[in-house]
Amino acid sequence: MVEKEMHLRVKAKKSEIHKVEALVEKVCDAYNIFHSYFGNILFSVSEAFEFAVAEKGKELKYIDLFFESRPNGLVFKVSLGDHFLEVAALFEKEIDQQLEKQEITESERSVVMIRMLADEVNFDSQLELLEMVFYITSINQHLTRERIRLLDAYFEKLKVTKIV
């Protein structure tokens, strides 16, 4: 179930990256996503955009970016057009195999980074889209654990025993 959607169409030029970054920032502000998770999302979506520009920027005038909010997380999609099958094939290789290579191409580096930072990477073959899913439910769990740790440390300094 999609809760919220956004669409952004930008020229297939690297100089349009600021519009992509603005979309990510707007979404992350709306969902109170900050720090490293914001960085993961921004870097992944930016890499996917730059990857799409590098792979098909000369052939297409525009690249479409989509955002969806789903119960399990935030989804960003980037159109890949004619090069969809080539790009999907790059994502089939194991990350370890790509990292072990002596030399890694710019495209392979982008693929590795996106796969490492996104929680899920999928492809929509009908619409020729690269889909990156970022789970946001675990953010609250991480925050809760961090708060518990900080409170425990605080009470440890006060020498107050914790009642369980």
Predicted regions and their residues:
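Conserved beta-strand-loop-beta-strand hairpin that lines the nucleotide-binding pocket
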Residues: 1-7, 51-164
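Helix-loop-beta hinge of the Bergerat
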Residues: 3-33
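A generic structural micro-environment signature
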Residues: 16, 39, 127-129
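Conserved short strand/loop->alpha-helix "switch" segment adjacent to the catalytic nucleotide/phosphoryl-transfer site
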Residues: 22-49, 99, 103-104
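Charged, alpha-helix-enriched surfaces in structured cytosolic catalytic cores
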Residues: 15, 36, 108-112
